[in-house]
């Protein structure tokens, strides 16, 4: 008997100028939760990445509604991932001709939803 693969929808955003460590802290809060509950949690978080993740999650929900005609109440966050993107390297000048490197990190955020 063939098992059916669960219907999944996803959304991703690339080259976000936020450190992946900061984004992962928020993504860990919404993993495994229903989409509606995750949206509510993100709406009231005071952190900068939470607004980006909120918009991305809304996009994933609307992708699921458009592609599979599913209600937002039956969706859950299957996977929430923040991968490291390219690092922008800058130089901060200091005294006596020295210069210290600054790494401006970027990340790629991916959210996958599945039906409960």
Swiss-Prot record:
Compartment(s)? Plastid, Chloroplast
What coarse category fits the chief subcellular location reported for this protein? plastid
* GO cellular component terms listed in the entry, alphabetical order: chloroplast; large ribosomal subunit
Alphabetized, the UniProt keywords read: Chloroplast, Plastid, Ribonucleoprotein, Ribosomal protein, RNA-binding, rRNA-binding
State its role: This protein binds specifically to 23S rRNA.
Q: Which GO terms describe its molecular function?
A: rRNA binding; structural constituent of ribosome
Q: Name the gene for this chain.
A: rpl22
Q: Which domain of life is it from?
A: Eukaryota
Q: Does the keyword rRNA-binding apply?
A: yes
Of which family is this protein a member? Answer: Belongs to the universal ribosomal protein uL22 family.
Q: Name one GO biological process term.
A: translation
Subunit structure, interactors included:
Part of the 50S ribosomal subunit.
Q: List the taxonomic lineage.
A: Eukaryota, Discoba, Euglenozoa, Euglenida, Spirocuta
The name this protein carries in UniProt is Large ribosomal subunit protein uL22c
- Source organism per UniProt: Euglena gracilis
């Amino acid at each position: 008997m063939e098992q059916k693969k669960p219907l999944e929808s996803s959304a991703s955003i690339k080259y976000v100028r936020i450190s992946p460590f900061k984004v992962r802290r928020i993504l860990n809060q919404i993993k495994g939760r229903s989409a509606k509950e995750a949206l509510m949690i993100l709406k009231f978080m005071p952190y900068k990445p939470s607004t980006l993740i909120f918009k991305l999650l809304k996009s994933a929900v609307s992708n699921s509604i458009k592609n599979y005609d599913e209600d937002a109440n039956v969706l859950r966050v299957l996977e929430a991932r923040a991968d490291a993107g390219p690092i922008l390297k800058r130089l901060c000048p200091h005294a006596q001709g020295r210069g210290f490197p600054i790494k401006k990190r970027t990340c790629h955020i991916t959210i996958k939803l599945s039906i409960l």
